[in-house]
């Protein structure tokens, strides 16, 4: 399966993840070490296999994953594609087998799994899931929706 991303552009515009830092007090990614006044990173970060192929790339905003994240197999085929908002999975998340067939597709909202489908390597549907509105996870989702509205993120 050919991926549709311009790997040259990702390497030119992005920053190698090895050149970034983790905050010791939060989940943020920093542009410099904390003792050198590191600030939350905004931009595109990537990591490479030894052969130069991209392992993954992630878009960050203010130190948190925000936007598209893609992972690749060493042969260059796409492994996964996920959307993040403010560090939380939000939207469609797809995982592929190395042969290019879809392995799973999930729908997330504020990192709460809303629905999921899983397939085997031949493309046969194995199972499906949808969140139950009576579940504790749905209560957490409602709380997170309210929080994001109050923060002006919705």
UniProtKB/Swiss-Prot annotation:
Phenotypic consequence of gene deletion: Deletion of the ywqH-ywqI-ywqJ-ywqK-nfi operon has no visible growth phenotype, however it is out-competed by wild-type cells.
Segments traversing the membrane: none
GO MF terms, alphabetically ordered: toxin activity
Entry coiled-coil feature ranges: none
Xref: SUPFAM superfamilies: Histone H3 K4-specific methyltransferase SET7/9 N-terminal domain
InterPro entries, A to Z: MORN_2 (IPR011652)
Superkingdom of source: Bacteria
One Pfam family matching this protein: MORN_2
Localization, UniProt: Cytoplasm
Induction entry: Expressed on rich and minimal solid media likely in early stationary phase; dependent on DegSU. Not expressed in liquid LB, but only under conditions that promote biofilm formation.
Keywords: Cytoplasm, Toxin
GO cellular component: cytoplasm
Purpose: Immunity component of one of 6 LXG toxin-immunity modules in this strain. They promote kin selection, mediate competition in biofilms, and drive spatial segregation of different strains, indicating that LXG toxins may help avoid warfare between strains in biofilms. Mediates intercellular competition during biofilm formation; disruption of the operon disadvantages the bacteria, but overexpression of the cognate immunity protein restores growth in competition with wild-type. In situ neutralizes the toxic effect of cognate toxin YqcG.
Subunit and partners: Probably interacts with cognate toxin YwqJ but not with other non-cognate LXG toxins. The interaction inhibits the toxic activity of YwqJ.
Protein name: Immunity protein YwqK
Taxonomic classification: Bacteria, Bacillati, Bacillota, Bacilli, Bacillales
């Amino acid at each position: 399966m050919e991926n549709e991303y311009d790997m040259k552009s990702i390497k030119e515009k992005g920053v190698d993840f090895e050149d970034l830092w983790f905050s010791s007090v939060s989940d943020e990614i920093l542009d410099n070490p904390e003792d050198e006044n590191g600030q939350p990173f905004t931009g595109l970060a990537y990591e490479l296999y030894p052969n130069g192929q991209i392992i993954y790339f992630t878009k960050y905003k203010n130190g948190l994953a925000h936007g598209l994240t893609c992972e690749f197999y060493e042969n260059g085929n796409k492994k996964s594609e996920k959307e993040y908002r403010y560090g939380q999975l939000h939207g469609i998340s797809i995982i592929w087998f190395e042969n290019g067939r879809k392995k799973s597709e999930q729908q997330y909202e504020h990192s709460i799994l809303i629905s999921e489908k899983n397939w085997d390597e031949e493309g046969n549907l194995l199972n499906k899931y949808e969140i139950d509105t009576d579940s504790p996870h749905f209560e957490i989702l409602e709380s997170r929706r309210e929080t994001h509205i109050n923060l002006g993120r919705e």
